[in-house]
């Protein structure tokens, strides 16, 4: 997505065009067809688990799906929210949005948003681990008979993107 660091502008525009507008909660038909949005946005660190964004109903599902990756130490499931990344645009219109918990590596301290934020700071083994886990969760989500459990639909948030106009 573009404009993430300026206020989730790219993902917000996509969600508004295809799924609904969180400022008035006028949802589009496609909103009911998407099961989940997965986001991997914190650099090259290994996946350690998933922020569930307060979605208690999905906890047993992800626990089962992550079990095969216990040897890769990707077992943490927290109901806590995490912010400042694109899954929030989807969550704001009632689509389950999840951010992976990752090892921070140098992400916040040395390379994040600097001219040092380049491919030579990637860790191939971490990327392979992350790709495997993300692919498995996307596959499990797609093959599931029903959509992932959803939290109650949030109230309209007319102020949510006012800061970025």
Describe the function of each predicted region.
Residues 1-61:
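Acidic/histidine-rich catalytic neighborhood of metal-dependent amide-processing enzymes
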Residues 43-165:
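Active-site-adjacent substrate-binding region
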